[in-house]
Amino acid sequence: MLLNCVFVGLGGAAGSICRYLLGLLPLKPVSGFPAITLCINIAGAFALGLIGALAGKYAKLNPQMLLFLRVGVCGGFTTSSTFSVETAGLLQSGKTGLAMLYTALSLLLGVTVVLLGQRLVR
């Protein structure tokens, strides 16, 4: 159990650092649209779909490696709490249309790339 926590923690650190570094990219949101967060969440959803499909196809994958990748790296990398804060900010600033677009794109693209990641393995 303790070793599993170490794997999750190391993966979370790696994912969080990657997330932080991507957030430093000098890209300015167009009309306040949080494109970097959207891209990070879509990439994380794709990675989770791909890893899950690989785990299903290759049963010999190390369970601790899966904890490291799924819960740790992907959990630290994706940003649903940031997504929620940014969506609330868009709503509070009267940008309801952008908030709805951001929410729809996040959900639709997220589910789509999970399926794509799974399909690539099959």
Residue ranges and their predicted role:
Residues 1-122:
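Membrane-interface helix-loop junctions in multi-pass transporters/channels
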